[in-house]
Amino acid sequence: LTKEVFKDKPNKYRYEPYRRKLAIMRYRLKLTRDRIMQPVEDGQLPGMGGYEHEQQFLHDLYLIRDSLYSHDDKQTADSELKDLIRLAETFGFNLVNLDLRQESTRHTEAVAEILEHAMQREYTALSEQERVDMLGKLVASGQCKLPDRQLLSDATCQTLDVFTVMKKMQEEVSPRAFGDYVISMTHAASHIMEVLFLASLCGLAGKRNNEWVGNISISPLFETIEDLEHIEPVLESLLSNATYRSILQSSGNAQEIMLGYSDSSKDGGIYASVWSLYQAQVRVHAIARSRGIRIRLFHGRGGTMARGGGPTHETILAYPPGTVQGETKFTEQGEVLFYKYNNPETAIYELSVGITGLLKASLNLVETPPEVDPQFLHAATSMAR
């Protein structure tokens, strides 16, 4: 790349190695940016030499830092360069992790159509356990291949296109480009396995060279009170599937579960909703402990009280004892984003009260959490009926 960068002035920065290195890095970043934006801007494909992923960029930054350290120039290395390294480590080339969300019936319909054309199997005629078992075997074996798209409906093609774009963006932008794939209205373990199957057809999950690969994080969303009450058998069935457990282990052995506050509140009232959510969190963490996996709860709340809103600090502290383990995740409704994060002062305040609440709620990691009075549990259950 040196000839291309300095083709007009080959001796530029000849005696300034750091500036010369930074000029090459800047050129590589431009090539990377042009490659990513080419489909959007309909421009020409850039030449070779850009960064393939943020780790290559970080490697160059670390190289400069270590060189400065070796020359006893720690002050320079720990100033603006350190800030840039932290930005690159935190945000990569993607800035944020984009979460995706789709309703469960779209996946069921897509899977049924694909299996009908590819394997002449009537998916909808199978029982719940048969669906889970068959999908697990197909993901593990890679036996099912995508049929000709001309045979598929527009809805199924649109569903598959999401996974195709995920695969492409992970390769072209960053492996961290996407966060979680949320399945709304999750009623059964097969709804999670359907997403895993569709992801495997597009190269996001399965087996490669006899090793499990899971480049998608699936987050089932339990929204109604009935679904919250059945969360235990759904997770037990899911985590009993050997294929799903293997892929989960290959991607960090962490499972995210999203809990819906708005729909459960409309379904049974605010109090019944809150208590069902409380019990669901306790049951989910009990399953996680018994299965040896890590659980992160994603709280779909915010805004008005009916939608699970409330002060951030107190809300986190109200989670069941022992269920917050150093991390939490919750939504912020559009109507409150402006008031909370419109200027740096209020944004810093909101993040501060959230972090302090998280630290307090995570004390169970270093000390035994207090036990909840059984009389309280009995009274709360009676009131929620």
What do these predicted regions represent?
Residues 90, 182, 297-299:
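A structural signal for short, well-ordered beta-strand segments and their strand-loop junctions
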Residues 113-115, 199, 236-237:
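Extended active-site and interfacial segments that coordinate phosphate-rich ligands
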Residues 1-172:
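Extended, charge-enriched "interface" segments that sit outside catalytic cores
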Residues 72, 167-177, 199-206, 239-243:
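Structural motif corresponding to the C-terminal cap of alpha-helices
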Residues 51, 55-58, 62, 75-82, ...:
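Conserved structured core elements
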